[in-house]
């Protein structure tokens, strides 16, 4: 008789076991030659060695499903243990799944171009108005890379000075000062990763969120690096950021040319970079438009109204 301990890593074991160990009971019923007990993140298995190997493969398939989709239904569980394709796997074009199980994927032609550009290039510029999903989709691509282990970390950054505000004149310590600028990045991550796992990854610096000034002097390797609100960088700041790129790293730079908050809009680093880097191999540029807006339908009308007013 063989005994083995299977350690459940990278996911909350409760998601695998099910409420009241309901999922585990279904799995155990299919392996009558085994005695299975679970405690914490360890499953203790005792019994026939061949059946144990099949059981271990089944547990790994379920773990991979939970890791990918952040959830597993009883129907999915039964499909997996019976060797069938799950409904979730049948959905095409999904980047990752939210913590509620909602598929995050392209919702417009230009969003799909962003995904394609990311897969084909090491550096991508995604430019478009608010609400086009450029930041959210970029973070989803980064989370996917982390889950698939094609990247070891995610680094997210924004310029910390916008709308004429300067950090030195804001109240509180440094974290209090920069967090409001970085909140949109936290919001996207919280939609895609369970809170406990996200907190653990941030404490281990697997996920790093920092203002642009903190990038100086670093070489960013084995990572997906995203710079948001790049239209509010100076040419010197953006050049500094772009040259941080290390081995096995992908960069996504997002920005909205209609929301430049610099004192001199002509001095936007994003405007200059798009001009200077045009046509360089390995750099993709994707332009999103108001047709790609995926927020409330009023957002599209608001953007159109402001554009019409600016033309008068």
Describe the residue ranges of each PLM region:
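N-terminal presequence-like segments and adjacent domain-start helices
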Residues: 1-14
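Short, surface-exposed acidic/glycine-rich loop or hinge patches that mediate macromolecular interfaces
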Residues: 11, 21, 49-50, 232, ...
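Short amphipathic alpha-helix segments
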Residues: 11-31
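Hydrophobic side chains in well-ordered alpha-helices
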Residues: 23, 55-58, 238
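Interdomain "pre-motor" coupling segment immediately N-terminal to P-loop NTPase/helicase cores
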Residues: 29, 36-91
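A broad structural signal for alpha-helix termini and local helix breaks/kinks
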Residues: 31-32, 193
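A short linear hydrophobic-aromatic micro-motif
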Residues: 32-36, 285-286
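Conserved helicase motor core of SF1/SF2 NTP-dependent helicases
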Residues: 97-109, 113-227, 231-312
């Amino acid at each position: 008789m063989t005994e083995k301990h299977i350690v459940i890593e990278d996911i909350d074991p409760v998601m695998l076991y099910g409420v009241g160990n309901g999922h585990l009971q279904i799995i155990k019923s299919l392996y009558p030659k085994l005695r299975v007990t679970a405690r914490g993140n360890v499953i203790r298995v005792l019994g026939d060695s061949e059946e144990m190997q099949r059981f271990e493969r089944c547990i790994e398939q379920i773990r991979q499903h939970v890791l990918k989709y952040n959830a597993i239904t009883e129907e999915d569980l039964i499909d997996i243990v019976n060797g069938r394709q799950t409904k979730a796997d049948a959905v095409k074009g999904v980047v990752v799944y939210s913590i509620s199980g909602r598929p995050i994927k392209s919702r417009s032609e230009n969003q799909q171009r962003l995904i394609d550009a990311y897969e084909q290039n090491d550096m991508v510029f995604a430019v478009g108005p608010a609400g086009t999903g450029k930041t959210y989709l970029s973070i989803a691509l980064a989370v996917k890379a982390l889950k698939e282990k094609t990247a070891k970390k995610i680094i997210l950054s924004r310029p910390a000075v916008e709308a004429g505000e300067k950090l030195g004149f804001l109240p509180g310590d440094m974290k209090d000062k920069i967090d409001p600028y970085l909140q949109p990045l936290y919001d996207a991550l919280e939609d895609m990763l369970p809170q406990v796992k996200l907190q653990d990854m941030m404490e281990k610096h697997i996920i790093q969120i920092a203002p642009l000034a903190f990038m100086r002097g670093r070489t960013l390797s084995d990572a997906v690096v995203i710079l948001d609100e790049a239209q509010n960088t100076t040419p010197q700041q953006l050049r500094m950021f772009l040259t941080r790129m290390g081995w096995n790293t992908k960069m996504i730079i997002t920005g909205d040319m209609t929301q430049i908050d610099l004192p001199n809009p002509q001095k936007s680093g994003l405007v200059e970079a798009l001009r200077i880097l045009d046509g360089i191999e390995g750099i993709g540029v994707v332009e999103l438009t108001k047709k790609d807006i995926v927020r409330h339908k009023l957002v599209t009308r608001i953007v159109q109204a402001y554009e019409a007013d600016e033309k008068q």
